[in-house]
C-alpha cells in the first residue's frame, strides 16, 4: 500500500508467550516486515540477526543499554554517577545496531536519585545525549530521545517535550531526534496531533499504544487512533510506527483497518 505509514512490531512487548528469538517468526507470520527490539542485549547480536534474516525482517529501532533493569535503572544519560557506564553503553549499542542493520538507537534518560545526580541531571543529560548524537553520526546511526510520562516511570528525567527541544536545539550534530510515543504524549500534555505538527521537523520515529492500559490501537481507551493515524499520514507518511503495546497473543486487524501497512 503506497503512501501509508509502515508498522514495526515491538518484540519485547508483543508475542511475550514466546522466547525472544521465536518472536521473529511470529511477527513474520502476522505479516510484519519491520521489527523493533527495545532491549536486544539478552541475546547475542548475531543470533538476533540470524532470526531476522531467516524471516526477511528488518530492524527499525533498538535502545542503548539502560543499566540494570531489575535494579530499577531506566537509562543512564542523566546520571552523573554513571558517566563511564553510559559511554561504554554507547559502544555496545553501536555494536548491536551495526550487526542488526538498524539505523536508530534510543538513548534513555534514566531516573536520577542521589542528591548529586539530581542536582546535575539536566546538564549531565544534555552533555551525554549530545555526545551520543555525535558518536552515532560517525556510524550513520540516528540518536533518538523520548519523553516518558511521569505515571509510567515516576522520576524519569525526560518527561516533557520542552526539555527535549532544549537539548535538540543545543545539539550541533543535527543527528538528535524525538521518538514520539503517543501513549506518553497523551499523558504528558494531550494535544497529540497539535504537538506532533509542531515538532514534525524534529521527530525521527513514532510509537503507539492505547491509554491507559497500553493495549492495541483498536482497543477502548482515551485515544482515537483513526484520527491520529490520519494526522500522522498527513504530516509524514514515511514515518515508521512502532507497535509498542502489551499483548502476548496479538491480533493486527487494526493495521489494515486504519489504512496502515506492514
From Swiss-Prot:
Keywords: Isomerase
GO biological process terms on file: glyoxylate metabolic process
Transmembrane segments: none
EC number: 5.3.1.22
Database matches in InterPro entries: HyI-like (IPR026040), Sugar_Epim/Isomerase (IPR050417), Xyl_isomerase-like_sf (IPR036237), Xyl_isomerase-like_TIM-brl (IPR013022)
Catalyzed reactions per annotation: 3-hydroxypyruvate = 2-hydroxy-3-oxopropanoate
Enzyme class: isomerase
GO molecular function per UniProt: hydroxypyruvate isomerase activity
Active site as annotated: 146, 244
Family classification: Belongs to the hyi family.
Primary role: Catalyzes the reversible isomerization between hydroxypyruvate and 2-hydroxy-3-oxopropanoate (also termed tartronate semialdehyde).
Name of this chain's protein: Putative hydroxypyruvate isomerase
Species the sequence originates in: Caenorhabditis elegans
